[in-house]
Amino acid sequence: MENFDQIFTLLAEHEGIGLNLNILETGLLNILTLVGILIYAGKDFLGSLLEERKTTIVKGVQDAEDRLNEAQKRLNEAQKQLNQANLVISEIRNETIATKKVLLESEVFGAKKDLKIRFERALAMFKSKERQIFLEIKQQIISLVLKRTVIRAQQAFAPKERATTLINDTINKLEGDLL
């Protein structure tokens, strides 16, 4: 705060702030000479630094462009591989679907064939049972007819010889019908 007061005191005593146009008193020549010497003497040094910096920047830009081109090439190659992989996946899916269809058709055909064989066996077994039952019924009917005939013959014909002959004739006729 003291310095601030001193500045105002000095300004008040010297009649304010003014511009000094005397070149020798201001040291402007010294500053310009110093800048000129620095430019002349530092031109080679500063030029080489700027040239190195320029070379480094250009090289960095070229490296970045090379990396960009390389990355672009790898991206294109990866996209080609992706497209090829998608084609292979699509082919595999199509082959899988075709194989599934063939397997299903084969299974359906096998199931139909198996069902047909089972149905034919069941039908043959049914016909066999039907024939067997028919023969058993026929045998029972013949047996009943023979028993009735024997009973009627015994009642109608008292003598044994006549009855035996009639029974034998009837049995022979019935056996002939069965065969």
Curated annotation (Swiss-Prot):
Q: Keywords, A to Z?
A: ATP synthesis, CF(0), Chloroplast, Hydrogen ion transport, Ion transport, Membrane, Plastid, Thylakoid, Transmembrane, Transmembrane helix, Transport
Compartments where found:
Plastid, Chloroplast thylakoid membrane
Family membership, please give it.
Answer: Belongs to the ATPase B chain family.
- What this protein is called in its record is ATP synthase subunit b, chloroplastic
Q: Which residue windows are transmembrane per the record?
A: 26-42
The subunit field of the Swiss-Prot or TrEMBL record says:
F-type ATPases have 2 components, F(1) - the catalytic core - and F(0) - the membrane proton channel. F(1) has five subunits: alpha(3), beta(3), gamma(1), delta(1), epsilon(1). F(0) has four main subunits: a(1), b(1), b'(1) and c(10-14). The alpha and beta chains form an alternating ring which encloses part of the gamma chain. F(1) is attached to F(0) by a central stalk formed by the gamma and epsilon chains, while a peripheral stalk is formed by the delta, b and b' chains.
- What function is annotated for this protein? F(1)F(0) ATP synthase produces ATP from ADP in the presence of a proton or sodium gradient. F-type ATPases consist of two structural domains, F(1) containing the extramembraneous catalytic core and F(0) containing the membrane proton channel, linked together by a central stalk and a peripheral stalk. During catalysis, ATP synthesis in the catalytic domain of F(1) is coupled via a rotary mechanism of the central stalk subunits to proton translocation.
The record ties this protein, via InterPro entries, to: ATP_synth_b/b'su_bac/chlpt
